[in-house]
Structure formats: C-alpha cells, structure tokens
C-alpha cells in the first residue's frame, strides 16, 4: 500500500467505491462470515471513520450504500481526503447520506502540496494562492457540511532560517483563518514524519504544531494528530496528546510499522482510545491506513481490530 497522503487521496478520488450491507451479498455458504460482520453492528464508543473504498471487496459502487454499510457496522463517521476532487453530485450525495444517518465527515484535504515551499514564504503571490485555495475549500465545505479542512504547510526552505519560516507560517495561517473562520470551518494542521514517508516537509511534530497553533491564536487553527506519523517522529503518544489537547481537533489512525489496522504494530491503541474517550472527545478519528490481510478476510479483520481496541472499560 502507498503510505503517502497522496496515495490515499488518489485512491479516494479514483476508486469512488462503495459498500453494501452484508445480507445483500453473502450467500448461505458464507453464513459464518455474515454473522461475524453482523456482530459489529453496535456503535463504537468513539467516532472511528473509514474512508470510501476501505471495504471495497464487499462493495458495489454506490456511495450511499457505502455509508449505510459503515453505519451498520457501528461506525458513526467517515472521511474522504479527496472529496474536493469529486464531482459536485458525488459530494452532495455523500453529504446527504451521512446526514440521513447522523454521521460525521472527518477532515477533507484542502491544501497539501508536498512538492513546493508555500506557507514558509513571505511572498504576496503565495498568500494570494493560499487565500484562493481557502475560498475554494469554503465552497466545498458548504456542499458537504464540512466542519474540518486539513492543511499541510508544505516543504521546508533550506535557504531560510527556521525561525523566519515559522513566523511566515504563522502569518499565512492567520490569513487562511480570515477566510475559514467566518464560514465556521476549522483548519487542522497535520504534522507528517520526515524519516520514512515525507522528507523535507516543514511540519513534523506535535509540539511544533502546538507552538504554531498557540501563536496563531485563532479558534479555526488546530491540529490533526496522526498517531502513525507521531509514533515515528516522537512517540510518547498519550503524554503528547495530553500536552497538546487544547489544540487537537481530529485524529488519524494507523499502526506502526506497516501503517495497517490496530494490533498489527507496536502501538497500544486500546489505551490510547481509552484516554481519548476519557477526555469526552466527540470528534472524528480517521482510519487512514491499510489492511494487513487481503480481500474480504482483511476487511472483516479491520472491523474486528477496532472492536478489540474499542473494548476498553469506561
């Protein structure tokens, strides 16, 4: 599986795959598998959010059926990184399907160009580009009832001191907030690891993102904490979540190594989820990872892995 953000966006935009409820496609010979999936129909304690296409081995192509299947499996949110690239009709269809079932939509990618320096620059043309992007994101958010928009501040400039770059990022984020805040949209900044997946990016650690959000000092500038990336960059996951709690608005999930479902790597998701739940968190946790097994078995295992990690005592 492509571990990069671009891989997830590309898959979401191209596949558009959807899911159907288990009884609609499983025959008598697969009764035991049907029962296993049906056992996951109780709602999860937290709003874990599959992406469109995550269960494509069980799927047709209807986006509404995709939403319904996830709801039947106990999920109360979904996410679609590439929803800005979908046709308007599909955007509206997703929004209506989620609204009908009372489900949330996690952060969509508004700006994440990994190939250029952008937020780190103090240039009028850069600012104009970012403002234009934010306005485009507002229009999409209106159609999809979007609450959160994901932003990656781009690459680090090797010819400019980091402190100057940080100041420029803060200024540019404030300009973005001027556009997003009146529309009720929260921009979430994502630190990404530079060791394995994204060398050269400016923002890579939760403490760094926290410092920037505190400096921007706007309610529309927060953090999406990607557990997979932060295990690689700094570890110490629960203490860092606790320290940055006031600035965290969303989570991304994935075990490490491998970036697959919980229990396939070194991260204790059950304890992490218990802590997040204890903070009365009502936001979305996007399942931005692959599956350790292929086919229908792998998809069933993903759901079961979340059942196991969600079985913490309250």
What are these regions, as identified by a protein language model?
Residues 2-71, 145, 203-225, 229-314:
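Histidine-acidic metal/acid-base catalytic patches
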Residues 11-24, 37-42, 120-222, 313:
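Active-site acidic/histidine proton-transfer and metal-coordination neighborhood
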Residues 54-56, 84, 111-114, 155-157, ...:
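Active-site-proximal loop/turn and secondary-structure-junction residues that shape catalytic pockets
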Residues 65-83:
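Catalytic domains of carbohydrate-active enzymes, especially glycoside hydrolases
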Residues 79-99, 153-157, 197:
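Glycine-rich, proline-tolerant flexible connector loops at the mouths of alpha/beta enzymes
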Residues 85-102, 133-143, 170-181, 238-243:
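Short amphipathic alpha-helices and their capping/turn segments at secondary-structure boundaries
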């Amino acid at each position: 599986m492509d571990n990069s953000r671009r891989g997830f966006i590309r898959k979401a935009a191209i596949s558009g795959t959807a899911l159907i409820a288990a009884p609609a496609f499983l025959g008598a010979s697969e009764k035991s598998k049907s029962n296993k999936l049906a056992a996951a129909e109780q709602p999860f304690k937290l709003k874990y959010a599959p992406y469109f296409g995550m269960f494509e081995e069980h799927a047709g192509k209807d986006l509404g059926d995709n939403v319904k299947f996830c709801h039947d499996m106990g999920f109360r949110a979904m996410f679609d990184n590439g929803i800005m690239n979908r046709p308007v009709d599909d955007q509206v269809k997703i929004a209506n399907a989620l609204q009908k079932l009372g489900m949330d939509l996690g952060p969509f990618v508004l700006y994440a160009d990994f190939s250029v320096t952008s937020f780190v620059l103090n240039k009028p043309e850069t600012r104009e580009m970012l403002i234009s992007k934010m306005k485009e994101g507002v229009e999409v958010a209106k159609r999809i009832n979007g609450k959160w928009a994901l932003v990656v501040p781009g690459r680090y400039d090797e010819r400019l001191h980091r402190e100057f770059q940080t100041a420029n990022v803060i200024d540019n984020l404030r300009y973005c907030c001027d556009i997003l805040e009146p529309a009720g949209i929260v921009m979430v900044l994502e630190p990404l690891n530079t060791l394995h997946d994204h060398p050269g990016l400016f923002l890579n650690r939760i403490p760094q993102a926290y410092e920037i959000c505190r400096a921007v000092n706007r309610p529309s500038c927060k953090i999406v904490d990607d557990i997979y990336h932060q295990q690689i960059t700094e570890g110490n996951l629960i203490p860092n979540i606790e320290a940055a709690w006031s600035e965290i608005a969303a989570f991304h999930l994935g075990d490490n190594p491998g970036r697959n479902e919980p229990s396939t790597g070194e991260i204790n998701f059950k304890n992490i989820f218990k802590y997040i739940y204890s903070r009365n968190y009502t936001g979305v946790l996007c399942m931005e990872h692959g599956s350790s097994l292929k086919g229908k078995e792998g998809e069933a295992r993903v759901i079961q892995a979340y059942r196991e990690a969600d079985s913490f005592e309250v």
